[in-house]
Amino acid sequence: MIKKTLPVLILLALSGSFSTAVAADKKETQNFYYPETLDLTPLRLHSPESNPWGADFDYATRFQQLDMEALKKDIKDLLTTSQDWWPADYGHYGPFFIRMAWHGAGTYRTYDGRGGASGGQQRFEPLNSWPDNVNLDKARRLLWPVKKKYGSSISWGDLMVLTGNVALESMGFKTLGFAGGREDDWESDLVYWGPDNKPLADNRDKNGKLQKPLAATQMGLIYVNPEGPGGKPDPLASAKDIREAFSRMAMDDEETVALIAGGHTFGKAHGAASPEKCIGAGPDGAPVEEQGLGWKNKCGTGNGKYTITSGLEGAWSTSPTQFTMQYLKNLYKYEWELHKSPAGAYQWKPKKAANIVQDAHDPSVLHPLMMFTTDIALKVDPEYKKITTRFLNDPKAFEQAFARAWFKLTHRDMGPAARYLGNEVPAESFIWQDPLPAADYTMIDGKDIKSLKEQVMDLGIPASELIKTAWASASTFRVTDYRGGNNGARIRLQPEINWEVNEPEKLKKVLASLTSLQREFNKKQSDGKKVSLADLIVLSGNAAIEDAARKAGVELEIPFTPGRTDASQEQTDVASFSVLEPTADGFRNYYSKSRSHISPVESLIDKASQLDLTVPEMTALLGGLRVMDINTNNSSLGVFTDTPGVLDNKFFVNLLDMSTRWSKADKEDTYNGFDRKTGALKWKASSVDLIFSSNPELRAVAEVYASDDARNKFIHDFVKSWNKVMNSDRFDLNNK
């Protein structure tokens, strides 16, 4: 009977979400039996073979051909067409769809760029069965007729966000706009959502700190527990949780208040009865005949007035399908007292509360207003109070703040505006989009490219430093939210210029020389032609690699397309870019134990995953970068060659050479390789290096590149992978 003492959200979770049952004959991955085995699955996710539309499907083109006005009309009609199997509150699905869009986008977090609306991950486990997403399976099912009609022209990710926008607009709110471009995923993402897979487990460590890279305070929540931290109705403590969670999702205090106040202007919460007695398993544990729907409610009709979602019950406003100032007015108009919902959840009602809110399904029945503990937090926290009172006295400022915050919430994970599609994209650019200046000059041509590469190699800069600079600049890219990369040449700006991994003093000298060459070249042009530093950084790295290949007897030319521009410091939010600082980069044999939350080898896989690399691409890149000697601080770890600076396959040849015996060194994460016969020290390595001979899957690839007939193949594979990283952020070439 211990369940009776637990917060309602936990009861909802225990009712069936997060099913962990394993069938007796279920085939498990290697990691199930050997949990210490390195998991390479992140490098094999979302392959083209998973996409039923086919590898050649061009979503951007399909979206651009979409009749957006017809689609929006169909959505608007759907909003007020109540279905008997899931009746609309107040005859309008708008608030329901706002919650769907919000909870799809709200999983985004800044530390690793994971989560967000892109991919439509709310359709898959575990998100589809999170306690905070109870009944959103019905929202998506209500949308299915629209998705069915427009098919490949709009992804689930785009449709859910657009539906949230249309819902707001249909209830009298003017949104800032909408951008398409969220391609759908076809399988669950592999994301670390918390240290414990139990629903609503605390995501804080033993010292009470919210673990990185997490943003939600409890497993299975989008942000925070609406009843208060751990289900305890403490508004001030709740404010602390809100501030931490929202800041990790890229929202400041004003944006946080605008989102909560704006969102809670609409709709109601649902807690008609005890979830323990009424609610079945979530989608992940529901029987097959439920067809992917979960949380079957056996009480009453199971829907309408009997609906159970969060366990809290009631509305914040007497006009829950209209955009009004009532939320803020009610927050300050009444003195609020704690009570419990019919489901037993902690919530707040006005003292001497009058029944003034119409029932969502029977207009003849009236209810009192209510607030969550998280709502009261906006009134009692000193900083939030300043903002809520300002918004209360300036409705226009509130409306504008909500519009901007909503647009940011639903588009933050899409990356730069260059990826946006459609005719509803706002003309205004925002600092959180990492804006870039337009190129107002003529691009360099093939003759210029050849000349600049020759001039770069004559600067006297070691080739390893040119390669290292290009890698440091481009490898900040994250495919999770399309941030970072070389475009903008932000490596010369704060904060990147002073990142430890970039060896600031050396980096500044390289950049000074390249900047001087850039200025000289541009000054000599008479036809409006210019080269950006961003282009020159990549070009110089290419030139150095071509030289390294030439030393190995291989002539090649790395493809190069100019078009990158140089951002200004004013276009670069230092705090926002600080989260991109690597805590580890296995490609440079760099690892900061004090700032990393996973091992060096796991960090390598995570980095490769962020760069959208496959297992062979990661392997080729690391082996090539090692022999070209680009390790941070000129570390000798993994430089398995007697000819550093020559692009060849010696890293793999020497790594797999059985004449070397490896043992741990006294220094942490360092290994010594001794000659088996003489005992002489031959090489030094990190765990990141040795994993390519110890892990069976990585060794299999390493053996290919170590083979006598694979020398040229390795060089060309390295160049192809290098070029992929250098162009990861070139959305003008390939709108991902």
Swiss-Prot record:
Q: Where is this cross-link: Tryptophyl-tyrosyl-methioninium (Trp-Tyr) (with M-249)?
A: W102-Y223
- What modifications follow translation? Formation of the three residue Trp-Tyr-Met cross-link is important for the catalase, but not the peroxidase activity of the enzyme.
Q: Where is this cross-link: Tryptophyl-tyrosyl-methioninium (Tyr-Met) (with W-102)?
A: Y223-M249
Q: What is its EC number?
A: 1.11.1.21
Determine if Metal-binding is one of this entry's keywords: yes
**Summary of subunit composition and partner proteins:** Homodimer or homotetramer.
Which purpose does this protein serve, as stated in its record?
Bifunctional enzyme with both catalase and broad-spectrum peroxidase activity.
- Organism name: Escherichia coli O157:H7
Concerning InterPro entries, the annotation shows: Catalase_peroxidase, Haem_peroxidase, Haem_peroxidase_sf, Peroxidases_AS, Peroxidases_heam-ligand_BS
- Positions that bind heme b: H264
UniProt keyword terms in alphabetical order: Heme, Hydrogen peroxide, Iron, Metal-binding, Oxidoreductase, Periplasm, Peroxidase, Plasmid, Signal
Reactions that this protein is recorded to catalyse: H2O2 + AH2 = A + 2 H2O; 2 H2O2 = O2 + 2 H2O
- The feature of type site (Transition state stabilizer) is located at R99
Annotated signal peptide: 1-23
Name of the featured protein: Catalase-peroxidase 2
Enumerate the cofactors the protein uses: heme b
Q: Name one GO cellular component term.
A: cytosol
Q: Which NCBIfam families match?
A: cat_per_HPI (TIGR00198), PRK15061.1 (NF011635)
**Where is the protein found, in the record's own terms?**
Periplasm
Which residues are named in the active-site annotation?
H103
The family annotation for this protein states: Belongs to the peroxidase family. Peroxidase/catalase subfamily.
